Amino acid sequence: MATQKLLLPYHFTHLDQKALDFVIDTFSRLENITVTVFNAYTPIPEIDTAATSVTGKLKGSLSYLSQKIKENETALNEVKDKLIEGGFAEKQVNCIFRPRKKDIAGEIIDLVASDHFDTIVLNRKHARVTRFFSGSISHKVIMSLKDVTICIVS
């Protein structure tokens, strides 16, 4: 049987933790599966902070954002470790942490298409049901992809 590829978009919320727990509980006993944990972050703009006094004040904010990105990368690797502790072999788990060029839904759709994922595990906010069907990431992904199993954890 061919190896199944599962994508777990992760953005450090409590709902993402629920999706992570679902993946561990449901898929960790399978040997023919790989899990990719994915996070696309907003890149920090390139600004010459020494040019003027106004842009010089941005240096602290840009430094904070750079630090936050590094912390998120470390946290994503901790998610990988949780998957391994949950029963996946190390060779079954990958991380993708990259700057985004589109909205989150577009990044997920492009990654699924380029890397041929079989399953995606998403979550949705506990908000009005109309948001689920109107403008959410889950809705955009569901409407855009074909021949992919999508699990929604709420």
Q: Predicted segments — roles?
A:
Residues 22, 71-79, 107:
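Short, solvent-exposed amphipathic alpha-helices that sit
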Residues 119-140, 144:
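Glycine-rich, Arg-bearing micro-motifs that act as flexible, cationic patches
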Residues 81-119, 139:
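Structural beta-alpha unit
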Residues 58-74:
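A short acidic, glycine-rich active-site loop
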Residues 2-61:
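Small/aliphatic-rich secondary-structure junction motif
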Residues 142-154:
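Short, flexible loop segments at boundaries between secondary-structure elements
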